[in-house]
Amino acid sequence: MKIRSRFEEMQSELVPVSMSETEHIASISSDATTEKTSELRDDSCISVSGDESSRLETGAELLSLDSDRILCQTNEHCSQIEVQESHIPDCGSGENSCANTDTCPEDSGQIDDFPGGDFTEQVSKTKEPEQTVTQILAELKSSAPAEAANPKTASASLYDTDCTRKLISEMKTVSASDDLLGEIESELLSAEFAEGHQVPNGLNKGEQALALFEKCVHSRYLQQELTVKQLIKENKNHQELILNICSEKDSLREELRKRTETEKQHMNTIKQLELRIEELNKEIKASKDQLVAQDVTAKNAIQQIHKEMAQRMDQANKKCEEARQEKEAMVMKYVRGEKEALDLRKEKETLERKLRDASKELEKNTNKIKQLSQEKGRLQQLYESKEGETTRLIREIEKLKEEMNSQVIKVKWAQNKLKAEMDSHKETKDKLKETTTKLTQAKEEAEQIRQNCQDMIKTYQESEEIKSNELDAKLRVTKGELEKQMQEKSDQLEMHHAKIKELEDLKRTFKEGMDELRTLRTKAKCLEDERLRTEDELSKYREIINRQKSEIQNLLDKVKITDQLHEQLQSGKQEIEHLKEEMESLNSLINDLQKDIEGSRKRESELLLFTEKLTSKNAQLQSESSALQSQVDNLSCTESQLQSQCQQMGQANRNLESKLLKEEELRKEEVQTLQAELSAAQTEVKALSTQVEELKDELVTQRRKHASNVKDLSKQLQQARRKLEQTENGNHDKDISSMGSRSSSSGSLNARISAEDRSPENTSSSVAVDNFPEVDKAMLIERIVRLQKAHARKNEKIEFMEDHIKQLVEEIRKKTKIIQSYVLREESGTLSSEASDFNKVHLSRRGGIMASLYTSHPADSGLTLELSLEINRKLQAVLEDTLLKNITLKENLQTLGTEIERLIKHQHELEQRTKKA
């Protein structure tokens, strides 16, 4: 009781001292820094108090160990150490950081003798750091107003200077707007340069000048773009340098802050330790006086501790007996659980046997199912193969029918052609007879005219000389008439020769027609033989189909049987699933019981571990006390090292700050110059972009005018051509249609050429405009409107091109039909002559691309697939043109024949009139 009263007196003496220390530290921190730094330092004070409490704990433990040596090392002292350890952390963690000194008097009250030599050494050690502490405080007071004076260095922002902040904000704002403008400009350029250059009234006078002007503008624009890009790159490099400098500056500041905080913490700890040492010296002096009185009280306390220990031992024995009873109960539970586990194992074994039987049955069923499925697959394959054969046979039958029909049609067509040619041959014979009669009549008339002329000449010679002049005039007239008649006779002779040539041609065609008739008759005989064969094959195939139908019915019956077996299998599977569910429920019960058994075992192991932990904790507490003593010695050494390092770092920080300020000023000047250059370049770019847009608009308008003029002129030309064709050829609708097709094809070629001419303009217009710093809503709206108009124009062009493509496709189809009909009419052998065969042989000997066409192997190494395809296309185009020319020539020949007949009739009528006259 006396010891406790003494402890309370010591606590009342120590509390005001600790409060005064905290007030003194708070006053220093408030005078040195701003509000933000004061909050940080208050936190540091709290942390210091925590460190001090740990160090005081170590001091208290040292004192307690000394008292153990003095006293008789009883169990009472160990219990007091445990009480002290439980009290000390609570004092250190509270708001009053210095309240941890309350535990110290208890330790001092138990000390009997303190060695004098150790104490003097400790006092001398504490006097040495007192001088250094005062110096460090003075330096901190001088550095605090300097930090408050320059708020730029104390700022917590990433970018300290106003210039860097402005630059980064401009960079962030410019990037989004520049991206948007770049996208719109690229779309505008691709849309506006798509249309061709159009000049008003269809005249292309200033195209070269405009092209040169566009090239100049484009080159100037590219140069300015390059300069702008270089400036942007330099600006980015400068910004990166500024950011690196700022980051280095911030890192140095953070290091400075941390070091200043650590220095302040060390100063506070040093002050507290000095005060604590003084208090301990006072307490040691008082404790020496009180040691004699404490011997008596200690003996009484030892007796009380013995009594308490006996009571605790009784309580521990009771707890041990209770634990033994619980252990016996747990053993009984364990035995019961094992019995239940054995019963469950037996049940499990029976269920496993049932499961094995069921699995065996399942395997048998699965094997049966596999066999049935294999049979089913085999039958399905047979069925599918038979179906494929039947479909193939049906297709072959249909093909044969189609071939038969086509051959019948060809025979009929050949017969009709023969009849028509025979009729035409008869007509030509009649015409020949008529022409021969006409020729004889013309010869007789000519002889009569000659005789008349001779008579007239004789009469004129016998007449009088007075009428000689008149007769000369009449002679001249008659000579002119004779010359006219002679010309008419020569024309008639030429007509006669032409008719003879036509007769020879008709004879040749008649011979060719007869040859074709013979070949067609032989083909008809062959086709009849093939028809008989196909009928026999059809009968055979029908028999095969009937057999396959019977086989398919058998297979269907087997499939039904397999389906029934499959249903039985599914029912067996369902039963097996029910059994599996029952097995799972039983397994879950077994697992629950096993978990209960494991839980009981774990409880036993936990009780054993608890007893082991109690013994190990006592050993740990003794080892920790010795470790704390060594830590106190190490901390005193590290304090001196840290103070020297703090001084060195302070000097290095000052040098770095001066260098930073110089570099910041240089960078500011460079950034200002770059900004001025950038603004000038941006103004130039804006002016050029406006000029380019105006030129584009002018080009678009001129191209539109040019296109409209060209369309008008093409329409007028077409109308004039139509009028000319109508005047020259009255009834030539087919010629007009062919000319229209050619004009449409030529129009398509022109459209392609114009598209190819415009494509480089589109590619050149796809040069994207670089970033602009500002966005005008009016400009954006105008550009959107222009884009919409361009989109509408493109849609119109697409519709026109689709219509044009449809027309071209229809024309191609018509031409293919004409070509097919022409090829079907005439065989390839009749078209080629002997001269063409000789030419082919000559070409094949010479070698080259044409030689590879007429030989089986390629004669030229340069002949590739692409080249051969191009040659094929060109030849096809030539073939189409020649076919069209041949068709037109035939039609022209027919018209010429009709005109010749008309002229002959007209001549006969004139001759009859002259005879009548």
Curated annotation (Swiss-Prot):
Q: Where is the composition biased (Basic and acidic residues)?
A: 33-44, 722-736
Specify the superkingdom. Eukaryota
Give the span(s) annotated as Disordered.
Answer: 1-52, 97-118, 701-769
A cellular component term, taken from the record's GO annotations: Golgi apparatus
| Tissue localization of expression | Expressed in postnatal germ cells.
Which positions carry Phosphoserine? 759
Taxonomic classification: Eukaryota, Metazoa, Chordata, Craniata, Vertebrata
**Would the keyword Coiled coil be found if you checked this record's keyword annotation?**
yes
Per UniProt, which keywords does this protein have? Coiled coil, Phosphoprotein
Q: Does the keyword GTP-binding apply?
A: no
Sorted alphabetically, the Gene Ontology BP terms of this entry are:
glucose homeostasis; insulin secretion involved in cellular response to glucose stimulus; response to bacterium; vesicle cytoskeletal trafficking
Coiled-coil annotated spans: 220-736, 778-822, 874-913
InterPro entries linked: CCDC186
> What's the protein called, per UniProt?
Coiled-coil domain-containing protein 186
User: From start to end residue, where is composition biased (Low complexity)?
Assistant: 737-748
